[in-house]
Regions:
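C-terminal substrate-binding subdomain of Rossmann-fold SDR/epimerase-dehydratase oxidoreductases
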Residues: 1-146
Length: 146
């Protein structure tokens, strides 16, 4: 299953990791001490759209075997407490003052990310097998602080 909390309409601003790293380097190189620079790509997408796009990319790269479509695996579950409806920033300052712009579009960055996960399953499966159990961390019933 691919659990979607609530209706999946929570919005996030998506930024490819290499673009994020480039932005941080740009701040180190040209930023003014004690100034704040918000980093964002203005790629605001709701969670359900992102999951559906991942499903579509997977169908192209690794067609499903046990189902007709990866989208059939999407399951809506109860929303988590305090689930913010939107995370996005105004990144105009880093663009205008430091000349930084993201280079990787949303779809291309997501496809590169999915390809990486498909090519490196042996590496990341070890992490999930031995530590993270896909449980919700930080809820009132967890004992992660014990």
């Amino acid at each position: 299953n691919l659990p979607i909390f609530g209706d999946g309409k929570q919005v996030r601003d998506w930024l490819y990791v290499e673009d994020h790293c480039d932005a941080i380097l740009r701040v180190f190189e040209a930023g003014i001490v004690n100034e704040t620079y918000m980093i964002g790509a203005s790629n605001q997408k709701d969670n359900i759209s992102v999951v559906e796009t991942i499903c579509d990319i997977l169908e192209e790269l690794e067609p499903p075997v046990r189902t007709n479509s990866y989208r059939e695996l999407i399951t809506f579950v109860a929303d988590r407490p305090g689930h913010d409806i939107r995370y996005a920033v105004n990144a105009n300052k880093i663009r205008t003052k430091l000349g930084w712009e993201p280079k990787t579009g949303f779809e291309n960055g997501l496809k590169q990310t999915v390809k990486w996960y498909l090519s490196n399953a042996k590496w990341w499966n070890k992490i999930f097998k031995h530590s993270y159990k896909f449980e919700r961390l930080g809820n009132k019933n967890s004992n992660w602080l014990d």
